[in-house]
Regions:
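A short beta-loop-beta micro-motif enriched in histidine and acidic residues
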Residues: 28-29, 38-51, 66, 93-95
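Glycine- and acidic-residue-biased ligand/ion/polar-headgroup-sensing regions
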Residues: 49-67, 74-77
Length: 220
C-alpha cells in the first residue's frame, strides 16, 4: 500500500519463521482436516474453542453482518488467536468474523487450552506477538488502499493482491468474485474494468483465473 500499490506480504514481513516454529511445536499427534473451497472453518469444535494451524491453501476472513471479505491469507498461517482471548478470559463470545476456505485447505485444530500450555512450555509468545503485529499492520495498510478509493484503484489493488498468491492457490480463485467479495462493487463495473485491462494486454484471465499480470496503469 505504498505509493498506491497493494501491500503484498513477503516472507520477512509475515514472520514465516515464527509461524513455522509454532507449527513445528504444536502439530504433534494431531490428525489434519481437509476441506474444499467454499466451506467454513469452525474454530468451535464440540463446544470448545480451537486454534487452527493452516498448512495448505488460502483462507478469507468474512464480516459476519454482510459477508464482506475483510482479509485473506495463504498457508502457512494460524487462525483463532484473537477469538482465543475471549475463551481464555471467559468473556462474552461475539465474534464479528468467520473463516471460509478460498481453495482446498488442510489444517490442524488444536484446543486453546492445549495451545496455551505448549506456548508457555516452548516459549512461543514472542512468535505469537509478531504474528499479531503483522496482522494489524497488514489490515491497516490494506484499508488505506481500499477505503475511499475509486473503483479502478480498488480493483488494481486486489489484482495485485491476488497475483501475490502462490500459483496453485491463485488458479483455484475466480478473479471477479475475489474482487466483488472484498469491495461490494457491481459485477458489471468489475467486468468492464477487467475487460479493458485484458484488451490492453495488462492481464490475462482464462475461465475466471488470473494467469498473467503486467504493469497496471496508474489510473483508468
Amino acid at each position: 500500500l505504498n505509493g498506491g500499490n497493494v501491500y503484498r506480504p513477503t516472507g520477512k514481513e509475515k514472520n514465516l519463521q515464527a509461524i513455522l516454529n509454532i507449527h513445528r511445536h504444536v502439530i504433534q499427534n494431531i490428525s489434519p482436516v481437509t476441506i474444499t473451497a467454499g466451506k467454513t472453518l469452525d474454530i468451535k469444535i464440540d463446544n470448545q474453542s480451537h486454534i487452527l494451524l493452516i498448512t495448505k491453501g488460502a483462507i478469507k476472513v468474512c464480516r459476519r453482518i454482510d459477508s464482506i471479505v475483510m482479509g485473506c491469507g495463504v498457508s502457512p498461517m494460524i487462525l483463532g488467536l484473537v477469538d482465543a482471548y475471549a475463551d481464555l478470559y471467559q468473556l462474552e463470545e461475539n465474534s464479528d468474523v468467520f473463516f471460509i476456505a478460498e481453495t482446498t485447505c488442510e489444517y490442524y485444530p488444536v484446543p486453546v487450552k492445549d495451545f496455551v500450555e505448549i506456548a508457555d512450555e516452548k516459549h512461543l509468545w514472542r512468535d505469537i506477538s509478531n504474528i499479531l503485529m503483522y496482522r494489524i499492520a497488514f489490515m491497516t495498510n490494506r484499508d488505506r488502499n481500499l477505503i475511499g478509493q475509486d473503483a479502478y484503484s480498488q480493483i488494481k489493488a486486489l489484482l495485485l493482491e491476488l497475483w501475490s498468491y502462490p500459483e496453485s492457490s491463485r488458479f483455484e480463485i475466480n478473479a471477479q468474485n475475489f474482487i466483488q467479495q472484498r469491495t461490494g462493487l457491481s459485477r458489471s463495473r468489475i467486468m468492464q474494468v477487467l475487460s479493458e485491462l485484458k484488451s490492453g494486454d495488462y492481464i490475462k484471465i482464462l475461465h475466471g483465473r488470473l494467469l498473467e499480470l503486467r504493469n497496471l496503469p496508474v489510473s483508468f
